[in-house]
């Protein structure tokens, strides 16, 4: 692998999936000048087109890859299994082959949904993944491949990502609440949450952490905000904050329901909380709320 310490003045970082909520946040943030981030669209770099991938690499002399690209529609993944697998697993294989050929590492972004079948409390990086839906299965398969393929690769697991861009639970609830609709919300799924903005702004420090982390065998990081919650509690907070903004009460009912009372195509974990090593992150100037 290239010694990234020698490239500190001019590291070229390829970010796949740059049009997603994290990628767009990353493009908005002014980052360290010594990192040059590339956010190619699918016409110039596509995980399903090896020729375009090779051309882009040769042209831009990439030193590190951050793979944000993923098929993330959990319910639709149960239907479009082939497309989901092509992006989340086969695409990662192609990316890994490209990285290996060019002697660069990959920071693979993954998910709490690699867990699901065992509801045995908060999951640390040593817990064995056991996905309960097809999306989680493809992400777990890509994790295994990334870790086993090269010692230069690192996996970062996020959970229930929310932010300004894209579609996410918080934005959906805001729309329903502002439309004065009563809402039934699941209350028995224990979750962690990751702010897209907090993750994006800390990517330069995560790259610093990456340089050291690849020296160890446990090349997995959990990255979430502090604390745990559930979707019902999150929805109540959203309503409270909206009432403060518009300065009036919102007269709707938010009803707590059980997972068994909600119909969906894909199963969701009852407990996908992630244990985060905040002390390790703080050693690299990553301080999470």
Kindly give the residue locations of the regions a language model identified:
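N-terminal Rossmann NAD(P)H-binding glycine-rich loop of SDR-like oxidoreductase domains
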Residues: 4-30
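SDR active-site strand-loop-helix element
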Residues: 16, 40, 65-69, 106-111, ...
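C-terminal amphipathic/interface module of NAD(P)-dependent oxidoreductases
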Residues: 1, 11, 265-289
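Adenosine-cofactor binding site in Rossmann-like domains, unifying the SAM/SAH pocket
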Residues: 35-55
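NAD(P)H-binding glycine-rich loop region in Rossmannoid oxidoreductase-like domains
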Residues: 50-87, 100
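NAD(P)-dependent short-chain dehydrogenase/reductase
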Residues: 144-192, 196-205
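Mid/C-terminal beta-alpha module of Rossmann-like enzyme folds, strongest
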Residues: 202, 209-264
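Catalytic helix-loop patch of NAD(P)-dependent Rossmann-fold dehydrogenases
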Residues: 86, 91-94, 114-156, 161
